[in-house]
Amino acid sequence: EGFMSLGYSGGKLFILAFDHRGSFQTKMFGIEGSPDPSQTETIADAKRLIYEGMELAVERGANPAATGVLVDEQFGSKVPERAKSKGLKLAMPVEKSGENEFFFEYGDDFGHHIEKFDPDFSKVLVRYNPEGDAAMNERQLGRLRTLSEWLHERNRKFLFELLVPAEPGQLEAVGGDSDRYDAELRPELMRGAIEAIQNAGVEADIWKIEGVDRKEAQSQVPL
């Protein structure tokens, strides 16, 4: 039953992503470590301003049924209710910010936080290179399978953002050129990553993947 309900049949989705946390506080505000209440409010105010830009877009004609926001609980906890009241789609992150390995932001309590805000999509950002650290990949797959099963048992949608960062040897093989890595190696590595993730029992409803430069490379990505 859960498998049959996989996917998203609502047509196009245009989602404004502002769920950045660690990078947002350091690069935008120069705040290191855990922000104090005053700093947290400053960051939260910036998130509200970003959200208000989306409300303005809807007022000017953007279709709310195809438009959404991806916002975090830490700094954007006031946004979900406002977004829902406007008929916007809501996506919220599950992963811990700023980690190379996927961890739950709220540990074993992840389900409570999802149910509290009731997003249309629960999103993960995962760095997975099929030729990377095998033990880390296995640990990530275990956590992702836990999340995938939890979501689909409750008929909740799973949004999977996949990044495939270059391993040192892969980058060396293309002369240290990141553009060549993206064009020549990443499409096949993305295919391998998605295959490994799905073979591990992790089923996403929506895949958000990095673009590929050549049309023939698109056929390598099994989606």
Tell where the protein language model's regions lie, with residue ranges:
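Alpha/beta catalytic barrel-like cores
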Residues: 1-136, 203
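Conserved, mostly hydrophobic/aromatic
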Residues: 16, 161, 207
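Gly/Ser/Thr-rich loops at beta-strand to alpha-helix junctions
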Residues: 22, 164-166
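Alpha/beta enzyme core
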Residues: 27-30, 48-61, 106-122, 129-130, ...
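Hydrophobic beta-strand scaffold residues
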Residues: 90, 158-160
